[in-house]
Amino acid sequence: MLVFRQLFDPTSSTYTYLLGDGERGEAVLIDPVFEHARRDSALLRELDLELLFTLETHVHADHVTAAWLLKQRTGSRIALAAASGAQGADRYLEPGEAVSFGRRRLQVRATPGHTSGCLTYVLDDESMAFTGDALLIRGCGRTDFQQGSAERLYRSVHEQILSLPAHCLLYPGHD
């Protein structure tokens, strides 16, 4: 059984997503926010889930990630795009790879444009995709900093996100 929670940080208008395999007790957190590490840790305990990975959709300019703090608290691993150029991750992700938790997997798709290291994570049955700042509600992420490119973002959104099946629900990084 898939466990899913959408969590929100009102200060940065940022979404964090928890996905877990309820039968195996393993989970991932996508884009955790530093100020909510305690909330996220408590939720994992409440749901009896072991956090395997914190997954970053990109290197964030608008909030501090909770990945390091959650790693210290839970022993989880940090994963982000190899193309991000960031240091200190336990796993650097390439397009086409998958991140497993229990019997479930998230496929890694490169969606550069907002930054050069943006990723979208697609659930194995293509029912859900986590787009970070590549595709937002009524818009997309800025392209005027962090090696952004409007042309690359347009191609990424059309080729990697809008090409998903019609039943796929899209979950953005911001409100």
Task: Identify the residue ranges that each predicted region occupies.
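Small/polar loops that bind or transfer phosphate-bearing groups
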Residues: 7, 28-32, 56, 103, ...
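Conserved beta-strand hairpin/beta-sheet module of binuclear metal-dependent hydrolase folds
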Residues: 1-49, 121-132, 138
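Metallo-beta-lactamase
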Residues: 25, 115-175
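Hydrophobic residues in well-ordered beta-strands that form the structural core
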Residues: 30, 78-80, 130-131, 172
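Divalent metal-coordination and catalytic microenvironments
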Residues: 19, 31, 58, 70, ...
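Active-site HxH/HxHxD metal-binding segment of metal-dependent hydrolases
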Residues: 13, 24, 34-110, 127
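Core dinuclear metal-dependent hydrolase active-site scaffold
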Residues: 6-7, 18, 98-124, 128, ...
